[in-house]
Amino acid sequence: MQPVYIQRIASIHPPKDHSPGNNRPYLQACEPDYKDIITNATLRRRMSRIVKMGVACGLECMGELSPEKIQGIITATGLGCLTDTEKFLNNLLDNKERMLNPTPFIQSTFNTIGAQIALIHQIHAYNMTYVHRGLSFESALLDAMMKIGEGSENILVGAIDEMTETCYTIQQRLGMLKGIAAGEGAQFFLLSREAGEHPLAEIQGVETF
């Protein structure tokens, strides 16, 4: 397989001390000031927390690279936009399936983050989202490597997930969190075909199990 090079990395993650805070039993991401990254106030106000987190991380990872040089945006998520999904389903139950606000449903779709990044920079290129739970990022990375193997020069790849109190409670009751700390965050990588002057790392393959 064609070697792939990591040129830039951006991350929004929990604090370094790895201790739950704000009276929450799970690790919550330390979010930046989004006003400096997502400058459109109207757009920013309409975004949910995970969408802002993912879009800001993706834009930071792109840096000063011209949007025309991005041949693809590939995102991955295990559970998607949980807050908006919960909000829409609660409205569905509370209003007995009548007079529903469509915004939470629109914002809860899995491809929202990749689409918003493309819309902000007018990137008319390959755009894909993988939702395979624990294999989501590996699937996105493998897709990016295949696209680069076919001739693409630069691909933006990212993984985003959020944790909510409802999701945490359900996972805990099902025994899914034994021995691990639940958390959330966003991570993006700018991958390229050529090594360039200062690549951060080289990826030679992807192994899943």
Q: Model-derived features: where do they sit?
A:
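Short-chain dehydrogenase/reductase
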Residues: 141
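Conserved "HGTGT" condensation-loop signature of ketosynthase/thiolase-family condensing enzymes
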Residues: 1-138, 146-152, 160-209
